[in-house]
């Protein structure tokens, strides 16, 4: 039986080995690239796959139609997911005749969702387990195939329980996989009335509330002990982490948070005292409790507290859906540079935002807007400004997957707009320069230019009309129901983290990334229809500054406005862009590590994009609205943008890859 496996972490390694031991053929393994901001104490699925000689992939979005097609070509009989962190689309789940099955780290239907290992310890459970279940659209809700119970000892912490669960998972898989291979797959529906759901835990969730019962505080210490981020508190402004503790029943009448003694170090809780066995001050080393007290300058009677508040004024909460994308990650950086903004974000990956994951004002959840509607509705209600940035926005996908473009770019975003109407929240919506289509004006005016697209049999326009229709719906909600909105139209923004060379390899990237990939790989630069199409290229820093000013909305001047954000002075044809890029490439200090230039190749657009494609000769913005509403003017020259973008991509190429 041929299997395709989605796996990560120690549990992923156990699953892969168990599937092999049961005699399955593994056609491919899909995993994740390690996050540099995460403590990767666990085994590497990619390394295991490489050692076993099994093809392994780590796409940013495995649910992308390109990857769905590739998985379909593998023709799996069965699909397994072992601690893979992303939900799989229904298209993938339906590819295997025998079904798709996930290993979950709890006794379902209890503890559905994220981090069940930590949550069972937080809640003081005495038993947990692992469950193999059939995968359906809703996470962790499918029929149960098999489960294995695991007792939780009073001295178990996150790491010891993790090891127990891995061992139980291996026993479970060794028992059930041979049976499944013979076609005998048990199926027991979950009792929805017994289901509980828990969300992702963040490092800041380790903050101790000394007014809680001592058992609650002790369980928190157990749940997030190393290698997890740890339970922590403050002595004044100094943070310290507690790595191990024990319960003492007598608080001697002390107030919660009071230091009862320093040797041993004991702190009063609501109904007892916590003895701190080991801990760590700031970024220092782990020491015993009495030494920690000495380091912190604690004395009996001192009161521990929460971190000091920075300001009495509530910060502005900004919800960014698609926060890991090009605009989303740069906008997050700009907002976090201002003290009065708090960012909440969702996306299907976190590679571009890994540098923010530990930031105290950045709150990220990995998820899909087409699945996590309850989370989105809750955060629309909670936040002040909403930016729905999720969209398929690469031309080749318009002809490859027009229905998927419509479903995501229009239908899913319309639901978010309706939440904004329902809760009366301000929305800053990304329209697109593509809505102008084949407009013949010398420069495109937001309030006067006609929006002209081609015939219905040219699916290339599905993105343009999806965005245009949403623009019109948003405008109508503003007129009829008082929705506060601003529409912004980016004109060919460029810069670091635009997309990836891997995306370019499958044709799903912006023009400059495709050009850079050709230089990196020593293949001819393809000029579609000769590359005579003109665009106005805008530096991401200029674009983000304009977008930031829209969010600030000084004097409410952006309400109900459509604003082009582009640089009319940076107009160039694609051929001119390629020539400028080649010149910068030849001068780059890493040039010697890459193959010789392979020349230019003129390609017909039909052969490259498909028969449903049409192009436009020029696309230049009028930026009068931006000047008037934002006091904004772009300032960065195109050459500077090209050089910085090129440098980012060249330095992202692995040294071994350069040499090959």
Curated annotation (Swiss-Prot):
Positions contributing to UDP-alpha-D-glucuronate binding: 393, 398, 432-433, 460, 492, 526-535, 613
Coiled coil: none
Subunit structure: Homohexamer, formed by a dimer of trimers.
Origin: domain of life: Bacteria
Catalysis: reaction(s): UDP-alpha-D-glucuronate + NAD(+) = UDP-beta-L-threo-pentopyranos-4-ulose + CO2 + NADH; UDP-4-amino-4-deoxy-beta-L-arabinose + (6R)-10-formyltetrahydrofolate = UDP-4-deoxy-4-formamido-beta-L-arabinose + (6S)-5,6,7,8-tetrahydrofolate + H(+)
EC number: 2.1.2.13, 1.1.1.305
GO cellular component: membrane
Source lineage: Bacteria, Pseudomonadati, Pseudomonadota, Gammaproteobacteria, Enterobacterales
Protein name: Bifunctional polymyxin resistance protein ArnA
SUPFAM superfamilies in alphabetical order: FMT C-terminal domain-like, Formyltransferase, NAD(P)-binding Rossmann-fold domains
Gene name per UniProt: arnA
Residues that, per the record, bind (6R)-10-formyltetrahydrofolate: 114, 136-140
The entry's keywords: Antibiotic resistance, Lipid A biosynthesis, Lipid biosynthesis, Lipid metabolism, Lipopolysaccharide biosynthesis, Multifunctional enzyme, NAD, Oxidoreductase, Transferase
Source species of the chain: Salmonella gallinarum (strain 287/91 / NCTC 13346)
């Amino acid at each position: 039986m041929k299997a395709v496996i989605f796996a990560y972490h120690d549990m992923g390694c156990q699953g892969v080995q168990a599937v092999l031991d049961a005699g399955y053929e593994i056609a491919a393994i899909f995993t994740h690239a390690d996050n540099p901001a995460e403590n990767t104490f666990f085994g590497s699925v990619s390394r295991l796959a490489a050692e076993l000689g099994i093809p392994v992939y780590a796409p940013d979005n495995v649910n992308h139609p390109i990857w769905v097609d590739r998985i379909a070509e593998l023709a799996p009989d069965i699909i397994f997911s072992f601690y893979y962190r992303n939900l799989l689309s229904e298209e993938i789940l339906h590819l295997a005749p025998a079904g798709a099955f996930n290993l979950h780290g709890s006794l379902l239907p209890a503890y559905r969702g994220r981090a069940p290992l930590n949550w069972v310890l937080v809640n003081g459970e005495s038993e947990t387990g692992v469950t193999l279940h059939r995968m359906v659209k809703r996470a962790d809700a499918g029929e149960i195939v098999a489960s294995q119970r695991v007792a939780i000892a009073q001295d178990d912490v996150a790491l010891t329980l993790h090891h127990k669960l891995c061992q139980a998972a291996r026993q479970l898989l060794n028992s059930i996989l041979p049976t499944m291979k013979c076609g005998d797959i048990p199926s027991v529906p979950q009792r929805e009335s017994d289901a509980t759901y828990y969300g992702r835990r963040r490092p800041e969730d380790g903050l101790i509330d000394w007014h809680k019962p001592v058992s609650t505080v002790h369980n928190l210490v157990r749940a997030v002990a190393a290698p997890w981020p740890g339970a922590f508190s403050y002595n004044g402004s100094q943070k310290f982490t507690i790595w191990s503790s024990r319960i003492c029943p007598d608080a001697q009448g002390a107030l919660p948070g009071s230091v009862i003694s320093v040797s041993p170090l004991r702190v009063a809780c609501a109904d007892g005292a916590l003895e701190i066995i080991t801990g760590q001050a700031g970024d220092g080393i782990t020491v015993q409790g009495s030494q920690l007290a000495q380091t912190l300058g604690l004395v009996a009677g001192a009161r521990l507290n929460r971190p000091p508040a920075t300001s009495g004024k509530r910060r502005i909460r900004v919800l960014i859906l698609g926060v890991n994308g090009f605009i989303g990650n740069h906008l997050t950086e700009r907002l976090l540079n201002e003290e009065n903004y708090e960012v909440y974000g969702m996306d299907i990956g976190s590679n571009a935002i890994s540098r923010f994951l530990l930031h105290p004002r950045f709150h990220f959840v990995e998820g899909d807007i087409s699945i996590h509607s309850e989370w989105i509705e809750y955060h629309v209600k909670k936040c002040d400004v909403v930016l729905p940035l999720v969209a398929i926005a690469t031309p080749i996908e318009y002809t490859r997957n027009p229905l998927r473009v419509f479903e995501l770019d229009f239908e899913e975003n319309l639901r978010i707009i309706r939440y904004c109407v329902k809760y009366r929240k301000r929305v800053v919506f990304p329209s697109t320069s593509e809505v102008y289509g084949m407009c013949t004006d010398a420069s495109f005016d937001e309030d006067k230019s006609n929006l002209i697209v081609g015939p219905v049999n040219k699916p290339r326009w599905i993105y343009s009309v999806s965005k245009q229709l949403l623009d019109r719906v948003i405008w109508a909600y503003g007129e009829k129901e008082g929705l506060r909105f601003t529409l912004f139209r980016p004109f060919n923004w460029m810069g670091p983290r635009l997309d990836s060379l891997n995306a370019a390899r499958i044709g799903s990237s912006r023009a400059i990334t495709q050009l850079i990939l050709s230089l990196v790989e020593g293949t001819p630069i393809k000029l579609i229809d000769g590359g005579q199409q003109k665009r106005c290229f805008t530096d991401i820093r200029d674009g983000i500054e304009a977008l930031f000013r829209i969010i600030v909305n000084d004097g409410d001047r952006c309400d109900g406005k459509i604003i082009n954000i582009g640089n009319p002075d940076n107009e160039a044809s694609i051929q001119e862009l390629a020539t400028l890029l080649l010149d910068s490439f030849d001068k780059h200090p890493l040039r010697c590590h890459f193959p010789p230039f392979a020349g230019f190749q003129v390609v017909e657009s039909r052969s490259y994009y498909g028969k449903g494609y049409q192009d436009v000769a020029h696309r230049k913005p009028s930026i009068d609205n931006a000047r008037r509403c934002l006091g904004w003017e772009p300032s960065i020259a195109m050459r500077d943008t090209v050089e910085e973008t090129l440098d980012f991509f060249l330095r992202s190429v692995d040294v071994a890859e350069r040499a090959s």
